[in-house]
Design a protein with these regions (language model features):
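Ferredoxin-reductase
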Residues: 2-13, 75-170, 369
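Catalytic-core signal marking the mid-to-C-terminal active-site face
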Residues: 440-558
Length: 558
């Protein structure tokens, strides 16, 4: 259900009190006996709010100590790259982490400009550090680096987040995050094992080193994007960083590569007062949401399109992207993925490994499969979460990984790994490359794909639930679906494992020739999500969703 104020400008009542949010970070102490106050890692680390005693100083002390102990046991002896975004809680949490990491003798690399550092920039720094002399990636041996990014991604301004990237540069696997969370929760109940020094001492110690993340990342971008094509075409690219960590990267990209990039809204404000309200009535900095991006779209339609041929967006930690085209608005991430797949695998990356696959999550559109099949590209379908692309991108088995929630990354032009975490900057730049090379923007190319492969209707519905009900999703099987048809079509598969890697999906996916739905719990919120798509009609999509809800509710009630 869409909130009445969705798409409307934020009002004073919608804004956080920054001093209160930061004050509660230090003042409130979590009780490890209360489930909601424990350390819980979702697909992207620990997230919560200081106001709800779910993201406080004690959490970060415990998690940082647990990470220091984990990397020691794992034999990680190189530097730890530390990034953070523009959320109000990110600065305090970053300082807390430095206090604990230094006390544990961890060599940390922080931004030499004291700037925000996006998620993909940390991933790229880890991977380039861990590259062997012959250009291959190392994941074993002395001197390997890892990292931490302090971010709740596009979550509301009240929230904080803290995630660990191991030596492979991307989201940590479940066995790693589970071990860190278990140790952190032990420490929450007993701080005796924690080492910590005051920040003023820690930041000046031999264990903290400045590193120019921005220049390191921007200098390397030419190995991923064809800047010559963009520059020679004169394509005018607008960028809205949504008040996030990429804000100071775009001017350097523009200057270094001689492009025509303009930053539409360069302000950084931890209240995000310049945003329009998202679908659920909250301020959420999601560059793929038509509601959150309505303020930008209105500004463009009021005359700013005179300056730009297309506009890209990034979220607070710049791991998600959004593409806005004239006479179209915000593109559906599924549609943009399909356009990228056809462009990249259709002859524009000749240096990629032969046979490297398209990686997609199982809740992404089947349009991607149809496009890939038309150019003989293999598709590997994995569970939700970018962590499932880490190893395939690392090895080159997958050349492109994309998910419906506007996260993607892809290989360098020479076929080596770029990042193993989502990168919101390169999709925006790729949109400019695609426009320059084809003479058509991504929305126009999507319309051509619809003519060839058919139109589809896609929707996600979120439903409140409990921790107990969320746990039941892991027990769902194909037998829980008694029906033989879905929206009038014969069911062709009832999946509890992803076909691409046979990993458990933590829920259920049911498919027919032209319809499908998938149901799974959120990793960070007490909701479950039902995704559905139909290539038949909007009415068929509604029927798919109705029948999916019956299946899920019946399974959860047993």
């Amino acid at each position: 259900m869409v909130a009445n104020n969705a798409g409307q400008p934020a009002t004073p009542a919608d804004l956080i009190n920054v001093d209160e949010v930061i004050g509660k970070y230090y003042d409130l102490v979590p009780d490890p006996e209360v489930p909601e106050q424990r350390v819980i890692f979702g697909t992207s680390g620990h997230r919560g709010s200081s106001l709800k005693t779910s993201f406080n100083e004690a959490h970060i002390i415990a998690i940082s100590q647990a990470i220091a102990e984990y990397r020691k046991k794992a034999g990680v002896t190189g530097p730890l790259y530390l990034g953070s975004d523009t959320h109000a809680l990110s600065g305090p949490a970053k300082k807390t982490a430095i206090e604990v990491l230094v006390a544990n003798g961890v060599h940390g690399r922080v931004d030499s400009r004291d700037d925000f550092v996006p998620t993909p920039v940390v991933s790229q720094a880890i991977l380039t550090h861990n590259r062997a002399a012959d250009g291959t990636q190392r994941f074993e041996g002395e001197g390997l680096a890892d990292g931490i990014v302090v971010t709740p991604s596009h979550n509301p301004p009240t929230d904080g987040g803290f995630k660990y990237d191991p030596v492979t540069g991307g989201p940590a696997p479940a066995e790693t995050t589970n071990a860190i969370a278990a140790r952190a929760n032990q420490l929450l109940g007993d701080f005796k094992s924690i080492k910590r020094v005051p920040y003023e001492e820690a930041i000046k110690s031999e264990y903290v080193e400045g590193f120019d993340f921005r220049e390191h990342y921007v200098d390397d971008l030419e190995n991923v994007i064809d800047f010559d094509v963009i520059r020679n075409s004169g394509v005018r690219l607008g960028i809205d960083p949504l008040g996030g960590a990429s804000v100071n990267y775009w001017p350097l990209i523009n200057e270094k590569y001689g492009l025509n990039i303009g930053v539409v809204r360069p302000e950084v404000d931890p209240t995000w007062r310049f945003m329009t309200i998202d679908h659920d009535g909250k301020i959420r900095m999601d560059p793929s949401s038509p509601y959150a991006m309505k303020g930008l779209v209105d500004e463009l339609n009021a005359g700013a399109w005179d300056k730009y041929d297309l506009v890209g967006g990034t979220d607070p930690d710049a791991d998600r992207h959004g593409i806005v085209c004239p006479n179209w608005g915000v593109m559906n991430p599924n549609h943009y993925i399909a356009v990228c797949v056809e462009y990249l695998f259709g002859g524009n990356r000749p240096g990629w490994p032969e046979g490297a696959a398209v990686g997609k999550t199982l809740v992404s559109s089947s349009l991607i499969d149809r496009v890939a099949a038309s150019i003989n590209a293999k598709v590997i379908e994995v569970p939700v979460g970018f962590k499932w692309f880490v190893d395939p991108l690392f090895s080159g088995e997958v050349a492109f990984g994309g998910e419906e929630s506007s996260g993607m990354s892809f290989l360098r032009k020479d076929g080596r790994v770029w990042t193993t975490d989502k990168d919101g900057l390169i999709p925006d730049l790729l949109a400019a490359e695609i426009t320059a090379k084809t003479g058509k923007n991504p929305a126009q190319l999507h319309q051509e794909q619809v003519e060839r492969f058919g139109e589809s209707w896609y929707k996600r519905v979120d439903t409140p639930t409990t921790l107990e009900q969320k746990a039941k999703f892991a027990k769902l099987t194909g037998d829980d679906v008694a029906a033989t048809q879905l929206a009038g079509e014969d069911i062709t598969a009832k999946l509890t494992e992803a076909p691409g890697n046979h990993a458990k999906i933590g829920g259920l996916k049911v498919t027919t020739k032209d319809n499908w739905f998938a149901a799974r719990p959120s990793g960070t919120e007490n909701i479950y999500k039902v995704y559905a798509e139909s290539f038949v009609s909007p009415e068929a999509l509604d029927k798919v969703l109705d029948e999916a809800t019956v299946v899920v509710d019946k399974a959860l009630s047993e």
